[in-house]
Amino acid sequence: MNESPDEVTKEVIRDMGKVRVHITTSLDGYVAGPNQSEKEPLGEGGERLHEWRDFLGLEGGNQNASDIVIAEERANVGAEIMGRGMFGPPTRGPWGDDPWRGWWGDDPPFHKPVFVLTHHEREPLILSDTTFTFVSDGIESALRRARESAGDEDVFIGGGADIINQFLAAGLVDEVELHVAPILLGGGARLFDGVGRDVTLEELRAIAAPRVAHLKYRVVH
């Protein structure tokens, strides 16, 4: 039986390396609180999601389990994809004459090519050793470009929730790691909304650490 072009594309993509999601979520499934704004980019109460990171690299050179998880997360990543909501600002529409340059200042922490999904075209933005390329023709195009940049390394889907959900629904993710914080947000940007019931996750590991549980899954295709 002949495969469709989309199926062939997915197989070629997987041969090049993994597509990985790593994201912090509340117990009720939110990766950001309600009413995200420039003042509160993670929404109301969303900053509590990342309190577990305060425990990383304890004084005296001690480590906890989260240090090991984060080191593994950052290894072998050649490119990253994010949505406009993660790049910012929270407002939408055309970029304008003096477009937003991201939340991270002139030296972003990525140090690799980043592809930003947006509905509005924009020229690439170079800040230090990070190049932001703005992609307006869909997630498959963004992944194809990220793969070309990453080579044999993995592609990291950074967020937000809507972008991750689109990639999961399209069957384009190989691994998902959830950093589950012991809080409830009650609303906001929710992971897995609209993904459907056909996505099967196989547990790879579960690690408990201060203020967080790290749950890693393989997406069964």
Predicted regions and their residues:
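Enzymes that bind and transform nitrogen-containing heteroaromatic metabolites
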Residues: N2-H221
